């Protein structure tokens, strides 16, 4: 069976391995050869009655306990082959057998930051540096004694085997901090290292292997058992995507060459400018609810109207395109979709066997659909709404079959081979790494959007478990409440990624890019356009208007 080919297998008594498939493989090659491209950071502030001393005392053991529940945080995706060549084609998990190995893993994975650094500063640092050593999938920081702000936990993870699941990992760590068994253990033995020695049991690979994350392709084959016709249908979608990318398109222009002294940076570390930007716009919970209501009445979704606003702003502000001769450019939409639409159980955040569930989507908006006969690219609000409906219809048409997943394996194999071949040749030629990333990217970046949906999670944690309750005014016992939260990304190539996510009732639109390659002021303006148009659209809908059928 196809699914069995990609399953986890015990290759030695304490080592499990499986092939990386599709987008996983593509991301692993990009991360390795493109200086940590696509790596993620997610942060939560903690409101708690635990002292700093207790947080620090419990943190490492809490993360160790989470590994027992979610062994994915111990996976690796860079290894070596028998001839010592680098292996980027497999994920591995090594079951820890000694308490010394366990303590080493804790020391390298659960890091306490207590030098005054704030959570916001630390996320800037994590997004501006690649995770070391290469292939490590997960590291988590506890920020205490910050110059300002409450304590915080920040996960810095590879995107290869992570996505929505990071929220579940964070919540599980928070729960572990107030777990009654951990509290009792440290009351009896206050030294965390001694406490670990008193409870350590070697990991049982046979027990853990069933909890390790499977590939999206494995889940797809198990669920749908595709026929030859189904697989052909998937490759037709791939052909459509390639055809769309060849059509003349608007986009965000990169600079003429990588900036050696970027105008916009977030400071320097060890003499190196921090130029990985995460420009963010946040819509609060009250306004977000109004937006959702308005869009339901208009018969559009929030992601589709945001995408329309991004596309229109790029069309108005950026005069660059890939058109030749007398061609009029449309818009090639390069976006990611989540496979939960086809595999809801397999990709469910808190019990998901599939952690990387991204599918590459595509659509092309023609010049006539993109612009108004009356207003050109200066669309009215009604015309923006029509553009949003057009984008939604095209996305629905492209994503009308789960068999698109079948083509992702070929995409992963071909793109990863291309990434490796190009990077190796450039390294052999002595090309500057930033110049290499610049040269490997298109002259313009087509309109992108990755919409991650609304991520809801319990925010109050006590020894009794997690709940949806608000932070208590007076607590009967220990608690940790998840306050402000945000996510960040690392985009190292010459592309601009717009990411949309709902967190705790708020809506956040973030743009990830490197200011060595793009004008940060231009991208700020695009974000401002989106926010302004969103608000104008919401105000055009009467309060008593009925909902439209989507």
From Swiss-Prot:
GO terms for cellular component: peroxisome. Pathway: Secondary metabolite biosynthesis. It is found in: Peroxisome. MELs not only have high potential as eco-friendly biosurfactants due to their excellent surface activity, but also have attracted considerable recent interest because of thei runique properties, including self-assembly, anti-tumor and cell differentiation induction activities, and moisturizing and hair-repairing properties. It is an enzyme of class 2 (transferase). Residues 548-550 are annotated as: Peroxisomal targeting signal type 1. Acyl-CoA-dependent acyltransferase; part of the gene cluster that mediates the biosynthesis of mannosylerythritol lipids (MELs), surface-active substances that enhance the availability of water-insoluble substrates. Mannosylerythritol lipid production is responsible for hemolytic activity of Ustilago maydis. This is Acyl-CoA-dependent acyltransferase MAC2. It comes from Mycosarcoma maydis. The gene is MAC2.
